[in-house]
C-alpha cells in the first residue's frame, strides 16, 4: 500500500509540477503586499484544490471526462470544449509559456537589455526546432529525464524557499497593487487559473487511470483509498510549496521598474537563487528550468497533436504537430508578460465551466441528475463567464453591473450560485441519468 501510494504520488506530482507554475506564487507574493494571506488562500484554492480534485474525480471515471461530458451535456459540446481546452494547454498558452519561462530564467539574465529581443528569437528558433523533431519521434528518454529532474528540481526550490525565508523574512512587504487591495482573495483565485492544472487534469485523466491500473491494485476499495490519500498529500505538498514561494516573493526586495511589469516572479526566482547560492547555482537553476520546460513542451505538442488527430483524423499527426509548433513559436516571441495577459480572458471562461463539470460529475456519483438540468447548469455558467469577460474587457457597464450583483462576485465566483441552482434543478427535472460505475479491470 505504501509503495503504491508513493508511486501514485510521484505520478500526480509529475502531472502537476512544471517550471512555469513557479513564477506565479512569488509574483502574487510581491503584488499582494499586506494582503498576502487572503491572496495566497485564493491561489491555493483554485491552483491546488480544484486541480487535485479534478484529477481525482477524473481517475474515478474509467472513460475520462470526454465520455462524461458527451453523455451528460452533448457530444458536440464535449468536442468543442476539449478542443479549446487542448489549444489552451497546448499551442496558445502553455507551450509558448514554457519556452519563454526557460528563456527568461536561463538566458535573459546573461544578455544586455539591447540584445534580449534578438536573444528570444534565436532561443525560440532552436528550442522549437528541437522540440518539433523530437515530437515526431517521441522518446521515453525524455520521460526518464523528467522523472529524475522533477524531484531534484523540487528539492532545489524547497531549499531556496527555506533559506529565503530566513534571509528575507524580516523585510517588509511592498504596497499591494490596486487589484489586491480591492479583492485579495478574488485576485488570488484568478491567479491560480494561470497554473492550468485543472484543465490539464481534464485532458490527462484517462492517461492517469491507465497508469494507475498498471500498479496492480487488488481491489476497487484499495484503489480509491490510495487515490484519496495521495490526493490529500499532494495537495498539502503543493500548498506548502506555493505558500513558501509566495512568502519569498512577499518579502523579497523587488525594484519598482520590475513591479510595474506586473509579473515579477521570474526576477524573484532568478535573483533569490543567485543571492542565496551564488552565480553557479543560478546557472544550475537555469539548466534545470530549461530542460524541465523542454520536456513539458514536447509532451504538450505530442498530446495536443494526438488529440486532434484522434478527433479529426483527416489531417495527419505530423501536420498537427507542425502547426502547433509554429503557433507556439510565434506566440512565444510576444514575451512572457503578453502571454499571461492575453490568456486570462480565456481561462476566466474555461475554468468556471470546468469546475461546474466537476461539480456535476461529483453529485451524479451519488444521485441521478436530469440531462436537461445539467445542460442548463453548463449553459448558465458559460453565459456568466462570457458576460464577465466581455464586461471587463470592453467596459460594458450593463454587464459589469449584472455580474457584480451576483453572489460571490467579489471573490471572482459570480457563477457559483447559478451553478448550484442548476444542479438542484437537475434533481427534480425529468430525463434522469445515473453515473457510470467505476470497475477495476
Which residues does each PLM region occupy?
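Membrane-water interface regions at transmembrane-helix termini and the short interhelical loops
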Residues: 60-64, 68, 126-149, 214-217, ...
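Hydrophobic, membrane-embedded alpha-helices of multi-pass small-molecule transporters
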Residues: 9-17, 163-169, 179-245, 284-293, ...
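TM-loop-TM module centered on a large, flexible mid-protein loop between adjacent transmembrane helices
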Residues: 65-70, 241-294, 345
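Hydrophobic, small-residue-rich membrane helices and short re-entrant helix-turn-helix hairpins
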Residues: 137-148, 185, 208-237, 255-267, ...
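Hydrophobic alpha-helical segments and their helix-loop junctions in multi-pass secondary transporters
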Residues: 91, 95, 154-180, 198-199, ...
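A generic transmembrane alpha-helix motif of multi-pass inner-membrane proteins
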Residues: 167, 370, 374-441
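Selective recognition of specific alpha-helical transmembrane segments in multi-pass small-molecule
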Residues: 49, 53, 152-164, 227-253, ...
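Membrane-interface loop-to-helix entry segments
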Residues: 135-164, 343-355, 374-382
Amino acid at each position: 500500500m505504501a509503495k503504491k501510494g508513493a508511486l501514485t504520488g510521484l505520478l500526480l506530482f509529475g502531472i502537476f509540477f512544471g517550471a512555469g507554475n513557479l513564477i506565479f506564487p512569488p509574483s502574487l507574493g510581491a503584488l499582494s503586499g499586506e494582503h498576502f494571506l487572503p491572496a495566497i488562500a485564493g491561489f491555493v484554492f483554485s491552483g491546488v484544490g480544484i486541480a487535485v480534485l479534478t484529477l481525482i474525480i477524473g481517475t474515478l471515471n474509467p472513460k475520462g471526462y470526454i465520455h462524461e461530458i458527451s453523455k451528460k451535456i452533448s457530444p458536440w459540446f464535449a468536442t468543442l470544449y476539449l478542443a479549446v481546452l487542448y489549444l489552451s494547454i497546448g499551442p496558445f498558452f502553455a507551450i509558448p509559456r514554457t519556452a519563454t519561462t526557460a528563456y527568461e530564467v536561463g538566458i535573459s539574465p546573461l544578455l544586455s537589455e539591447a540584445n534580449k529581443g534578438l536573444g528570444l528569437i534565436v532561443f525560440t528558433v532552436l528550442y522549437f526546432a528541437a522540440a518539433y523533431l523530437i515530437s515526431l519521434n517521441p522518446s521515453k528518454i525524455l520521460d526518464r529525464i523528467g522523472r529524475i529532474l522533477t524531484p531534484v528540481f523540487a528539492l532545489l526550490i524547497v531549499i531556496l524557499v527555506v533559506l529565503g525565508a530566513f534571509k528575507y523574512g524580516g523585510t517588509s512587504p511592498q504596497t499591494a497593487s490596486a487589484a489586491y487591495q480591492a479583492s485579495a482573495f478574488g485576485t488570488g483565485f484568478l491567479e491560480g487559473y494561470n497554473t492550468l492544472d485543472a484543465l490539464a487534469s481534464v485532458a490527462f485523466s484517462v492517461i492517469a487511470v491507465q497508469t494507475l491500473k498498471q500498479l496492480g491494485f487488488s481491489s476497487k476499495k484499495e484503489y480509491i483509498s490510495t487515490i484519496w490519500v495521495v490526493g490529500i498529500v499532494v495537495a498539502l505538498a503543493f500548498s506548502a510549496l506555493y505558500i513558501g514561494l509566495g512568502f519569498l516573493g512577499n518579502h523579497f526586495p523587488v525594484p519598482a521598474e520590475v513591479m510595474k511589469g506586473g509579473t515579477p516572479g521570474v526576477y524573484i526566482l532568478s535573483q533569490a537563487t543567485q543571492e542565496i547560492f551564488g552565480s553557479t547555482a543560478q546557472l544550475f537553476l537555469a539548466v534545470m528550468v530549461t530542460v524541465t520546460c523542454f520536456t513539458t513542451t514536447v509532451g504538450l505538442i505530442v498530446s495536443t497533436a494526438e488529440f486532434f488527430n484522434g478527433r479529426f483524423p483527416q489531417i495527419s499527426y505530423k501536420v498537427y504537430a507542425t502547426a502547433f509548433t509554429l503557433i507556439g513559436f510565434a506566440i512565444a516571441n510576444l514575451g512572457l508578460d503578453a502571454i499571461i495577459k492575453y490568456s486570462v480572458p480565456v481561462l476566466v471562461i474555461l475554468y468556471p465551466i470546468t469546475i461546474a463539470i466537476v461539480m456535476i460529475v461529483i453529485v451524479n456519483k451519488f444521485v441521478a441528475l436530469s440531462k436537461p438540468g445539467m445542460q442548463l447548469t453548463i449553459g448558465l455558467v458559460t453565459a456568466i463567464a462570457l458576460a464577465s469577460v466581455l464586461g471587463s474587457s470592453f467596459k460594458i457597464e450593463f454587464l459589469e453591473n449584472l455580474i457584480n450583483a451576483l453572489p460571490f462576485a467579489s471573490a471572482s465566483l459570480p457563477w457559483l450560485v447559478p451553478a448550484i441552482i442548476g444542479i438542484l434543478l437537475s434533481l427534480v427535472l425529468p430525463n434522469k441519468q445515473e453515473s457510470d460505475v467505476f470497475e477495476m479491470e
